[in-house]
Amino acid sequence: MMTQAASGIDLFIPEVYDIVWSLIILVIVAVFFYKFFMPKFNAIFDERAAKIQGNIAKAEQARKDADEAKAKYEAQLSTARVDAAKIRDDARAEASHIIADARSRAESDAAQITASAQRSIESQHQQAIVSLKGEVGALATALAGKILGAKLEDNDVQSSMIDSMIDDLGAKK
């Protein structure tokens, strides 16, 4: 028997036995691939996924740590600013207090110096008055003696005459 050669579209369609044997080989290769290669691929993929997840977790933890450090730094910075402002205000208050104390002491010292100078002036004034009374008295006695032509020897008379002349001079001022 002679077989007829295929023609037309039949040239491209395989025979049934070719399809069956191809399917059997495909199933064997798929089972072999599924049994031996897939677990290794899955292990590698799982390992990479775990590594990626670990890196993501590490990055997330690092971000949280950075946020916490930033918050802590900002809190410390805020506290430092508050402390600096408090120190500045305290220094200003202390400076005002020191200035007020220095001013008070200067005013007190000036008042003491003024009072001391006033007392000194008053003392010198009294000394000048006493000295002038003595000199005026001596001059008045000498003048009265020349006018009267006699020397006034009685101390009581001299004193009363000196006092009356000084009073007359004081009244004329």
UniProtKB/Swiss-Prot annotation:
Cellular localisation: Cell membrane
SUPFAM superfamilies, per this entry? F1F0 ATP synthase subunit B, membrane domain
The protein's matches in InterPro entries, at most eight in alphabetical order, are given as: ATP_synth_B-like_membr_sf, ATP_synth_b/b'su_bac/chlpt, ATP_synth_F0_bsu_bac, ATP_synthase_B_chain
Q: What would be one Gene Ontology cellular-component term for the protein?
A: plasma membrane
Repeat found in the keyword field: no
The protein's UniProt keywords, in alphabetical order, are:
ATP synthesis, Cell membrane, CF(0), Hydrogen ion transport, Ion transport, Membrane, Transmembrane, Transmembrane helix, Transport
Instruction: Mark the transmembrane ranges.
Output: 19-39
Give any Pfam family that matches: ATP-synt_B
Membrane association type: Single-pass membrane protein
Q: What is its main location?
A: membrane
What Gene Ontology molecular function terms does this protein carry? Answer: proton-transporting ATP synthase activity, rotational mechanism; proton-transporting ATPase activity, rotational mechanism
- Keyword check for Cell inner membrane, yes or no: no
What binding partners and quaternary form does the record give? F-type ATPases have 2 components, F(1) - the catalytic core - and F(0) - the membrane proton channel. F(1) has five subunits: alpha(3), beta(3), gamma(1), delta(1), epsilon(1). F(0) has three main subunits: a(1), b(2) and c(10-14). The alpha and beta chains form an alternating ring which encloses part of the gamma chain. F(1) is attached to F(0) by a central stalk formed by the gamma and epsilon chains, while a peripheral stalk is formed by the delta and b chains.
**Protein function:** F(1)F(0) ATP synthase produces ATP from ADP in the presence of a proton or sodium gradient. F-type ATPases consist of two structural domains, F(1) containing the extramembraneous catalytic core and F(0) containing the membrane proton channel, linked together by a central stalk and a peripheral stalk. During catalysis, ATP synthesis in the catalytic domain of F(1) is coupled via a rotary mechanism of the central stalk subunits to proton translocation. Component of the F(0) channel, it forms part of the peripheral stalk, linking F(1) to F(0).
Task: Write out the similarity annotation.
Answer: Belongs to the ATPase B chain family.
The protein here is known as: ATP synthase subunit b
**Source organism:** Bifidobacterium longum (strain NCC 2705)
